[in-house]
């Protein structure tokens, strides 16, 4: 049925006469018959009747009032849709090639769900099914999630770990194909994470940072390209020496990723460089850039004479720049020391760090001297016998706390007798000590020579004309650009909530790290996309997904009839514009 009308003219005015009619077929001819004649109607009345007819003919439509509409629930969806679309753009389903579960929830789908959760609202694997029910995940993925439970997740974690190498290969091939030049420099680094519990064989007590002390740990390694995208990662026992973790990665770069003999440079932090690792990289026909630890500088053979006699001017508080050093920026001056043996060394000098090193050392020495005076004063007034070992340990521990143990010889405890008069007027002899400790002035002098000094090391030794083919600026910049790999660990720990681990088997620990790397990969790509349109780097910020939060699917109900309808919240103009600019305008749901 529909609202029909006919027109007539009277005294040059046009009048409409309305009726309710319906169409029917007479053989092959379409005809119309009038059911009710209504006559003259206002425009508002005509619109109301059209609405009534529309409702009558459609079971999913109802006439109601705004005040009778209630919101039954809302479920977040847009941030999930963004992460899901980025997963699809990189075709990450194809990264799973080995022993994939053949079910409505295959291995790659579970991995996708876990990755999206890490990107948008990280929680434990036990809580993921509850998170899925509370969000619009089902609408975004368009799949049945009724079989998603913690048993299913733990089952698939084993299979996710079995696919680690194929995932690494997929990320490498995808990023290398897109930008081969992004592998001219690759970065390698490690960090630690800790456990709740003691059951995992991979975990061990190690040298992690403060938050890891007293907890079993694992060592996490990652290789990233020059754009910050990860392509290989590992989990090592927590007590593994960093210097021993590089071999497998270099072998993979040479054999699996075929990066040998392609002018690829591995950049890694001080502490990882060793003669064996340097030889390993050269055998793979690759280059490396690193820096020396403070205790490696003097034995390296670089000339430290330019730093002799340097001091902070008492009037200007400035430091003279050593002769022959060129400016890199306000915080670094450098001198290319050339090749010593088979390695190239570039000596750096930071005047700000020089002043800090000098000030910190002087302050620590003064603090210890004050402590020693007080300790001797207390020993001279001892009320009870003092023990030799306990007294000596207390002095050494204070030196260790101040990190100046190397500046002093072992403390000498000279026995003394303290005469103590008791309340009954008798006298008692108390055994105590006077502490003497000598400063190693030669050690302090040698250490002062390294204040503000850093040394970059590389095997970029090829000559070009009168200089080197690779300029010192390039080597320094590559090393100082390590912040991109520090971003990986900051994102994985602080935003993807990697730590602490709540799983126990080796395979599950490695799979959780793999999921976090996949989530970081997606976050890094989204961050780069937003940077490409002129926005800030939101990688390690809650602002990365903020424009897509609170864009929900709402279930609306008519309180009179009980009928419900599900609608996606209308996009704010700024969010809609952002999605269009990063080519994600299609992810917003229009129909459910």
Place the predicted regions along the sequence by residue.
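Anion-binding and metal-coordination hotspots
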Residues: 2-5, 15-17, 27-28, 33, ...
């Amino acid at each position: 049925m529909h609202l029909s009308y006919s027109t007539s003219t009277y005294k040059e005015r046009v009048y409409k006469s309305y009726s309710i009619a319906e169409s029917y077929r007479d053989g092959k001819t379409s005809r119309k018959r009038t059911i009710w004649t209504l006559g003259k109607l206002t425009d508002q009345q005509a619109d109301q009747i059209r609405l009534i007819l529309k409702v009558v003919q459609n079971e999913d439509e109802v006439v109601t009032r705004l005040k009778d509409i209630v919101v039954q629930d809302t479920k977040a969806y847009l941030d999930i849709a963004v992460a899901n679309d980025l997963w699809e753009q990189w075709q990450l389903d194809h990264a799973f090639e080995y022993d994939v579960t053949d079910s409505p929830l295959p291995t790659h789908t579970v991995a996708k769900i876990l990755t999206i959760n890490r990107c948008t609202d990280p929680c434990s694997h036990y809580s993921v099914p509850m998170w899925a029910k509370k969000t619009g995940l089902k609408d975004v993925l368009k799949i049945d999630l009724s079989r998603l439970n913690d048993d299913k997740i733990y089952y698939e974690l084993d299979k996710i770990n079995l696919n680690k190498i194929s995932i690494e290969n997929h990320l490498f091939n995808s990023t290398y194909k897109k930008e081969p030049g992004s592998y001219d420099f690759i970065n390698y680094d490690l960090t630690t994470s800790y456990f709740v519990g003691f059951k995992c064989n991979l975990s061990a007590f190690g040298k992690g940072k403060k938050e890891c002390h007293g907890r079993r740990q694992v060592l996490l390694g990652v290789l990233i390209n020059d754009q910050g995208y990860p392509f290989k990662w590992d989990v090592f026992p927590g007590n593994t020496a960093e210097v021993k973790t590089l071999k497998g990665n270099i072998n993979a770069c040479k054999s699996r990723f075929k990066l040998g003999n392609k002018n690829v440079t591995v950049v890694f932090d001080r502490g990882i460089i060793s003669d064996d690792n340097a030889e390993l990289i050269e055998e793979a026909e690759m280059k490396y850039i690193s820096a020396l630890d403070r205790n490696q500088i003097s034995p390296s053979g670089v000339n430290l004479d330019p730093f002799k006699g340097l001091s902070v001017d008492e009037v200007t508080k400035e430091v003279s720049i050593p002769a022959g050093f060129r400016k890199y920026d306000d915080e670094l001056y450098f001198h290319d020391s050339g090749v010593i043996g088979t390695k190239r060394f570039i000596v750096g000098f930071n005047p700000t760090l020089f002043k800090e090193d000098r000030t910190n050392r002087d302050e620590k020495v003064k603090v210890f001297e004050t402590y020693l005076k007080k300790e001797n004063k207390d020993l001279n007034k001892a009320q009870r016998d003092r023990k030799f070992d306990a007294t000596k340990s207390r002095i050494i521990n204070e030196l260790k706390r101040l990190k100046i143990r190397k500046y002093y010889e072992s403390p000498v405890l000279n026995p003394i007798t303290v005469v103590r008069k008791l309340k009954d007027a008798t006298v008692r002899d108390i055994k105590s000590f006077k502490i003497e400790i000598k400063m190693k002035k030669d050690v302090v002098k040698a250490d002062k020579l390294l204040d503000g000094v850093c040394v970059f090391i590389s095997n970029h030794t090829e000559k070009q004309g009168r200089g080197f083919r690779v300029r010192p600026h390039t080597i320094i910049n590559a090393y100082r650009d390590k912040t991109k790999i520090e971003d990986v660990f900051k994102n994985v720990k602080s935003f993807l909530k990697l730590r602490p681990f709540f799983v126990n088997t080796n395979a599950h620990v490695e799979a959780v790290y793999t999921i976090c790397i996949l989530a970081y990969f997606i976050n890094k790509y989204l961050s780069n996309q937003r940077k490409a349109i002129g926005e800030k780097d939101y990688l390690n910020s809650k602002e990365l997904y903020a424009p897509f939060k609170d864009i929900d699917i709402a279930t609306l109900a008519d309180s009179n009839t009980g009928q419900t309808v599900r609608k996606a919240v209308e996009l704010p103009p700024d969010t809609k514009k952002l999605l269009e600019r990063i080519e994600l305008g299609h992810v917003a749901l229009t129909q459910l």
